[in-house]
């Protein structure tokens, strides 16, 4: 039994995640990387946005088949990183997330990428119809305006309809990198697994009834469920858009979660519920 392929594969992946996340050819420790450390490294010229993005993409390529965190990847991530490097050289950092690789849950719009909400009917690859937005969700646009690089869109149960497991009709089952026999939490389990497995520095999840808190608890992350109206819901596929749906950050440390919340919070004319938060920001 000890020599069975499944045991060896699982054991090797778990051991790999316990080791420092140094990647051959990039020399960047991804496991403990923070937004502050990234900005310090960029300022010191230790590496570039392209270097960092390549490192994360290499790690995803190496381990994603085991954990299944993603529904889709952003094919333009490296091009965006290159443009951010040019911008950095000419005018400095765009914001606190300049060149920071992040992920978003696949019920949030990203211009040009399919939004499935985990449902096979919103994917031509599964026999449905692709839903391709022309604009970013408000929270996603704010991440990008702050310099973040969206690496991909993460798995979720169909229509974010489960709070313990993350199993979609589009991408199947997402696993928990800490223990693949345990649930990753849901419905933002894909984002939690991506951050936990060091596929990204941080990510966005959504919550209606525990969907940020549950996977954050299951995977030892800092997840923030904001007050309704603090973060715009424009461009997010709703479960209950009346007063309980929220978008929030998921990260490995409090600082990164707080910085991200500061970036995505605030009013927008496309979501009038956000104007109630103006005096509380």
Place the predicted regions along the sequence by residue:
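Structural signature of FAD isoalloxazine-binding scaffolds in flavoprotein oxidoreductases
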Residues: 213-218
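A short helix-breaking turn/cap at a secondary-structure junction
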Residues: 197, 225-281
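Bacterial N-terminal signal peptides that target proteins for export
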Residues: 1-10
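Ligand-binding "clamshell"
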Residues: 219-225
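A broad helix-preferring feature
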Residues: 11-17
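Gly/Ser-rich catalytic/binding loops embedded in alpha/beta enzyme cores
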Residues: 27-209, 227, 247
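Boundary at the C-terminal end of the N-terminal hydrophobic targeting segment
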Residues: 23-25
